[in-house]
């Protein structure tokens, strides 16, 4: 979340940023934040004054008794008791103001960087780069859901029987392809210096608030109400929360973690042709990169993550493009985000396979994730993460773009993992 210092010292800049993100009632919300903060400070000033007075009186009581000034000593005792009661009310008011302030801050999104373009939605995103070679397929090329059925790779109907729509069953070589991609992505991350983490796939509410999925995305998360736990929408949540309430040494940075997990998203309101097959699922596999760094290094870290994801797509021989997201299409928590999309030749559309984001200090402030400098100062870290990669649409693109009369061609980079050139 935004810090009080950010809001009080840069109010106009914060408001401009929130307007770029199309955050409703930005002026009213920030005015409330400032009001709650003023009340908290006013009560703190009175409380500090009262505590100083009570402390001074308490010290004087013994001396007054020695001097035989019993009435003055009793008056001092009475005043100390009175101040204690007043201070209880002041502390209660301060606690309530702090709670109200915290609740309000949780509802305010991150402020985008100046380099984020203006815009309302996906149509306003800026194409930064197009790479890879588009595949020329015959007019009767099949979409991936038909290829999956033809080669008995994925059974969507069986998933509906077992669970419901959006929970496919991978079979035979389809399951092997999933495992091949997961191992390939993890191996590539390891080569780039990432330490693999195997985290839980359920988290508590504190973790959801720490990375910003709560309260913003609560309606899109699967909630186990009996135990008050949430199925993770991405490994970002448990991996980043490893560093909640942690003060790191400067020499430990950057931290580079990767994790493969199943991810769960309700995707409420999704329907139509764009959600067919693997295009949008409730459960899917993904490898996630998480980095924690010093503020002055986070731009470089972000670029290194972008280069890593681009390298994966190049090795998979897929046509891709990189988008700089506009303010209106960015996530609640991001300060800067780039999306990677692969082209689906059979569907004639682009499919998002990765978002790589810099959160500045937004998540770190929620998490209380800090580092100690060489000068012994404590500063908030910058957090970054990105998919490397999400499997469903990668599988869709691989099947569609590599279909041949003989079967599905496997990219050279995956052959060591699949053991064959053709499915």
Regions found by a protein language model. Give the residues of each.
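TRNA-recognition modules of translation machinery and tRNA-sensing kinases, especially anticodon-binding
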Residues: 27, 129-422
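N-terminal alpha-helical targeting/anchoring segments
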Residues: 1-135, 153, 157
């Amino acid at each position: 979340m935004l810090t009080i210092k950010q809001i009080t010292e840069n109010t106009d800049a914060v408001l401009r940023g929130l307007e770029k993100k199309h955050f409703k009632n930005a002026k009213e919300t920030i005015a409330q934040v400032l009001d709650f903060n003023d009340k908290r400070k006013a009560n703190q000033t009175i409380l500090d004054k009262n505590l100083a007075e009570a402390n001074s009186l308490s010290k004087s009581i013994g001396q007054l008794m020695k001097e035989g000034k019993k009435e003055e000593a009793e008056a001092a005792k009475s005043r100390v008791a009175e101040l204690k009661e007043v201070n209880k009310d002041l502390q209660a008011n301060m606690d309530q103001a702090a709670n109200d302030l915290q609740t309000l801050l949780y509802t305010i999104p991150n402020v985008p960087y100046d380099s984020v373009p203006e815009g309302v939605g996906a149509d306003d995103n800026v194409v930064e780069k197009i790479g890879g070679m588009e595949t020329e397929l015959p007019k009767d090329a099949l979409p991936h859901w038909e290829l999956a059925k033809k080669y008995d790779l994925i059974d969507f109907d069986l998933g509906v029987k077992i669970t419901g729509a959006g929970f496919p069953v991978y079979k035979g070589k389809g399951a092997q392809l999933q495992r091949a991609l997961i191992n390939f992505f993890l191996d590539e991350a390891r080569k780039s210096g990432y330490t693999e983490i195997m985290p839980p796939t359920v988290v508590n509410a504190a973790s959801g608030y720490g990375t910003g999925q709560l309260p913003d995305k609560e309606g899109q998360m699967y909630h186990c109400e009996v135990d008050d736990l949430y199925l993770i929408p991405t490994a970002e949540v448990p991996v980043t929360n490893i560093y909640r309430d942690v003060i790191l040494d400067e020499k430990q940075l950057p931290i580079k973690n990767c994790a493969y997990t199943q991810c769960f998203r309700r995707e409420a309101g999704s329907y139509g042709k764009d959600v067919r097959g693997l295009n949008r699922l409730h459960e899917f596999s993904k490898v996630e990169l998480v980095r924690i760094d010093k503020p002055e290094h986070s731009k470089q870290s972000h670029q290194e993550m972008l280069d890593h994801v681009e390298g994966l797509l190049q090795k998979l021989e897929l046509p891709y493009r990189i988008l700089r997201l506009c303010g209106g299409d960015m996530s609640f928590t991001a300060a800067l985000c780039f999306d990677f999309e692969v082209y689906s030749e059979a569907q004639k559309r682009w499919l998002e396979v990765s978002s790589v984001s810099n959160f500045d200090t937004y998540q770190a402030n929620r998490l209380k994730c800090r580092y100690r400098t060489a000068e012994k100062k404590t500063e908030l870290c910058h957090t970054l993460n990105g998919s490397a990669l999400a499997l469903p649409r990668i599988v869709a693109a691989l099947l569609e773009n590599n279909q041949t009369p003989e079967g599905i061609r496997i990219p050279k980079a995956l052959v060591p993992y699949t053991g064959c050139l053709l499915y």
